[in-house]
C-alpha cells in the first residue's frame, strides 16, 4: 500500500541538539542545592532551553524520583522533554516523560575550576522528530582562553567564554553572550551580555553601541525596562561595578 504525500505535513526521522542533565546522585536535596547554586549567577543562561534527564550514570539498583527532578529543572526555567536511560532502568518510563535515545557528543558546561564536579549539563544529540531549523548550539571556550566571535549572533544563540570574550559582529535581540571575564563588543549589542558570571566583580563590559536587553556583571544586572539615558543609549560605553552597583560610562575612543 502506498501513501500519498501530504502537502500539509510530513513525519520523518531526524535529530535535534538539546541539553542533557546528567544525574549522578540519588541525594535530591544535594542535587537541588547544587543546581540552584550553579544557576543563581546566570539565571538567563539556559532559560527556556529544552533538556533531557539522563540517569545512565546511576549505579545498578539506584533510582530517583524523576518527577522531583523535573520540577527542579522547571524551577530554574528549563523545560524537560524526556528521559535518557539504560535498558535495565525500566523505572525511568514511569515519570510521564518519553524515553529518548542519545548519541553522545558532549560539550561540558562551564564551572569554576576549584569546584568539585557537580552533576553536569552537557549538550548531546537526542533522537526526535525533525523540527523547524533551530539556532546554532552554545559555543564554549577552553578554560581561561579569550574567545573571539566574528559572526553575527541571531536570536536564540548563546556564547559562553571561560575567560574574556571578544565579539566583532552584532548581537541581535534574543541572543546571549556570557563570560567569566570581561566582554568586548565592537558592534551593536541588542541582546544580553553577562560578564564575571562566577562572581568576578572586577569584570567589565566594553561596547561600541549599547542597545541591550540586559547587562550584568557578577550577577548584578539591569534591563532596559527602565530606558537608558540618551547619552549612553546607542553609544560607546564601558560598564563596571562600584559598591555593588552597575556604572555605565561613556567610552572615549579618540
Swiss-Prot record:
Keywords recorded for this protein, A-Z: Cell cycle, Cell division, Septation
PANTHER family xrefs: SEPTUM SITE-DETERMINING PROTEIN MINC
Pfam family, one: MinC_C
TM region positions: none
Functional note: Cell division inhibitor that blocks the formation of polar Z ring septums. Rapidly oscillates between the poles of the cell to destabilize FtsZ filaments that have formed before they mature into polar Z rings. Prevents FtsZ polymerization.
Protein name (Swiss-Prot/TrEMBL): Probable septum site-determining protein MinC
Subunit structure: Interacts with MinD and FtsZ.
Recorded family membership: Belongs to the MinC family.
GO terms (BP aspect): cell morphogenesis; division septum assembly; regulation of cell division; regulation of cell septum assembly
UniProt organism field: Burkholderia ambifaria (strain ATCC BAA-244 / DSM 16087 / CCUG 44356 / LMG 19182 / AMMD) (Burkholderia cepacia (strain AMMD))
NCBIfam families assigned: minC
Amino acid at each position: 500500500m502506498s501513501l500519498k504525500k501530504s502537502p500539509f505535513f510530513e513525519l520523518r526521522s531526524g535529530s535535534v541538539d538539546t541539553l542533557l542533565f546528567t544525574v549522578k546522585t540519588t541525594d535530591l536535596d544535594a542535587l537541588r542545592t547544587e543546581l540552584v547554586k550553579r544557576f543563581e549567577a546566570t539565571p538567563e543562561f539556559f532559560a527556556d532551553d529544552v533538556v533531557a534527564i539522563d540517569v545512565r550514570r546511576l549505579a545498578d539498583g539506584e533510582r530517583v524520583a524523576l518527577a522531583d527532578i523535573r520540577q527542579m529543572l522547571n524551577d530554574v526555567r528549563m523545560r524537560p522533554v524526556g528521559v535518557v536511560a539504560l535498558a535495565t532502568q525500566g523505572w525511568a518510563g514511569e515519570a510521564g516523560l518519553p524515553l529518548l535515545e542519545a548519541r553522545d557528543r558532549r560539550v561540558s558546561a562551564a564551572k569554576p575550576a576549584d569546584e568539585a564536579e557537580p552533576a553536569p549539563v552537557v549538550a548531546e544529540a537526542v533522537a526526535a522528530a525533525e523540527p523547524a531549523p533551530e539556532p546554532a548550539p552554545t559555543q564554549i571556550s577552553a578554560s581561561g582562553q579569550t574567545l573571539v566571535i566574528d559572526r553575527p549572533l541571531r536570536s536564540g544563540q548563546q556564547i559562553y567564554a571561560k575567560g574574556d570574550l571578544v565579539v566583532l559582529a552584532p548581537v541581535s535581540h534574543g541572543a546571549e553572550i556570557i563570560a567569566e571575564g570581561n566582554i568586548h563588543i565592537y558592534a551593536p549589542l541588542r541582546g544580553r551580555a553577562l560578564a564575571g558570571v562566577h562572581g568576578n566583580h572586577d569584570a567589565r563590559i566594553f561596547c561600541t553601541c549599547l542597545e541591550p536587553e540586559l547587562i550584568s556583571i557578577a550577577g548584578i544586572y539591569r534591563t532596559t525596562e527602565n530606558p537608558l539615558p540618551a547619552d549612553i543609549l546607542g553609544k560607546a560605553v564601558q560598564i563596571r561595578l562600584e559598591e555593588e552597583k552597575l556604572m555605565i560610562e561613556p567610552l572615549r575612543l579618540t
